[in-house]
From Swiss-Prot:
Pfam families: PNM8A, PNMA_N. Disulfide bonds: none annotated. Residues 256-269 have a biased composition (Low complexity). It comes from Bos taurus (Bovine). Signal peptide: none annotated. Residues 238-247 have a biased composition (Basic residues). It comes from the Eukaryota. Belongs to the PNMA family. The lineage of its organism: Eukaryota, Metazoa, Chordata, Craniata, Vertebrata. Residues 188-300, 321-471 are annotated as: Disordered. This is Paraneoplastic antigen-like protein 8A. Residues 270-287 have a biased composition (Basic and acidic residues). InterPro entries: PNM8A_C (IPR049131), PNMA (IPR026523), PNMA_N (IPR048271). The gene is PNMA8A.
Length: 471
């Protein structure tokens, strides 16, 4: 039956006939002629309305003929019987069901209305060739029915394409959002690391902080001492070596004596124990305020007051005056000069001979012996020889400066030959010991000045405390 329906459709296209008014009659014997065919059909179709036989064809599969019949307008195809008897057997009638076309057209119109499209838009979308103008309305409906199948296939493809495009866009957006979140998390983690670990730049910056030069004044007033710089041991020793090579040795300058120095000096002679107690209290106060000190600086200060066979001059008034100057500067409660100079104030205030010792510490030994020996040893020096008698009246008290005597003492080598071996060796040994003590004390003073001049009062009190025992 399907083959007969396809044959009817193809035949109507070839004959340009309306498929809705065409009939296909099959089962006609091969030897049946045109008159006999019309006579048989006349008995069946004439009551329904006019008809005409358009053409005949032979079917090999059925080994029979088939006739294409067109009925007139107004004939109801449903009233035509599907089978009727004829010559050679049963003849069958095949036609298009009108209800099938009506339902299809109805569905097509509803679809176009929902999409807000027309049949022309469908043709343009599918790029179909414009068909020839139909002769009747039924003819155009048939053409559009064929185009609908193509349209539905295209619509399905478009829907699939749009769905895939939307899915790809959503996936791309999800990936972009994930990347943005990852970048934000990395940035926040990096910011936290920077806040927690400032790095080596902050440590190096703290090591470059300058020390406050007025910090020792704050210590004298009762404040906290200056904090030590945070540096490596290797870098500190290297910088100190460079300073020792580049900076020349600074000579001590005596402090200016205040008007009330005599009274304070006398007070210091009368009450040495009270001054020692005050100096010890200040020493403990300074040590408490200077907890963060460098070990190297502490060792340098410990080496400064080296105990040796040092003999102070016999003129006690000058020594007492120097003690008075030191105690007076402590009682005033302030530092008039740098801490380095204050540590040596007890010597430089009234004893230029000691200053001369320090200046010519690298000079000849005889010069140091002349200025540092006690007056009780003068008889030993007078035994030098015939030239010693000339030097005796020229010698002055240890407190008087004798800068012009150094050349004569150095140039009296030939005259000093008659000196006895005992006194020469003893004087030479004493000179070496005094020179070593002076050199050690000068090295301690230089290290103390370069390390920041810390704890000058401790050195002063210790040196002053050693005077009675040394004398």
């Amino acid at each position: 039956m399907t083959m007969a329906a396809n044959l009817l459709e193809d035949w109507c296209r070839g004959m340009e006939a309306d498929i809705h008014r065409s009939l296909l009659v099959t089962g006609i014997p091969e030897d049946c002629g045109q008159a006999e065919i019309e006579e048989t059909l006349n008995g069946v179709l004439s009551p329904l309305g006019p008809y005409s036989v358009l053409n005949k064809i032979f079917l090999r599969q059925e080994n029979a003929k088939a006739a294409l019949v067109e009925v007139g307008e107004g004939v109801n195809l449903r009233a035509i019987p599907r089978e009727f008897p004829g010559r050679g057997g049963i003849w069958r009638v095949v036609c298009r069901d009108p209800t099938q076309d009506a339902e299809f057209l109805k569905n097509l119109n509803e679809f176009l209305d929902a999409e807000e499209r027309t049949l022309e838009d469908v043709v343009h979308l599918l790029e179909l060739s414009r068909a020839s103008p139909p002769k009747t309305q039924n003819r155009s409906t048939e053409n559009w029915a064929e185009a609908l199948g193509v349209l539905l296939g295209a619509v399905v493809q478009i829907i699939y394409y749009m769905d895939a495009e939307m899915l790809s866009q959503e996936e791309a957006r999800a990936q972009d959002l994930a990347k943005a979140q990852a970048v934000a998390s990395l940035a926040s983690a990096a910011g936290r690391k920077v806040k927690k670990e400032p790095g080596r730049a902050a440590e190096r910056g703290s090591a470059l902080k300058m020390e406050n030069p007025d910090g020792w004044n704050d210590v004298a007033d009762g404040g906290d001492g200056p904090k030590p710089l945070v540096r490596k041991a290797g870098a500190l020793t290297h910088s100190r070596r460079k300073r020792q090579k580049k900076t020349p040795k600074q000579e001590p300058v005596p402090w200016k004596k205040s008007q009330g120095s005599h009274s304070h000096s006398s007070a210091s002679l009368k009450h040495p124990e009270a001054d020692d107690g005050k100096n010890r209290e200040r020493l403990e106060h300074v040590r408490n305020n200077k907890k963060p000190c460098v070990k190297q600086e502490g060792s340098a200060l410990k080496k400064a007051p080296v105990k040796c066979a040092w003999k102070f001059p016999s003129n006690l008034p000058h020594v007492a005056a120097s003690r008075g100057v030191a105690s007076e500067s402590d009682q005033d409660g302030g530092l008039e000069g740098p801490p380095k100079k204050k540590a040596m104030g007890w010597v430089s205030a009234k004893s230029p001979a000691y200053m001369r010792k320090k200046k010519v510490s690298l000079g000849p030994v005889s010069y140091v012996l002349v200025n540092s020996e006690d007056p009780r040893k003068k008889p030993g020096v007078s035994k030098k020889g015939p030239g010693s008698g000339q030097d005796a009246p020229d010698q002055k008290a240890p407190g008087v400066p004798q800068a012009h005597e150094s050349p004569t003492s150095a140039s009296q080598g030939p005259e000093a030959k008659p000196q006895s071996p005992l006194h020469a060796s003893s004087g030479e040994n004493d000179g070496r010991s005094h020179l070593g003590c002076v050199n050690k004390w000068m090295e301690g003073e230089e290290q103390q000045g370069k390390a920041g001049a810390q704890e000058p009062k401790w050195a002063e009190s210790q040196m002053v405390g050693e005077d009675p025992s040394a004398v």
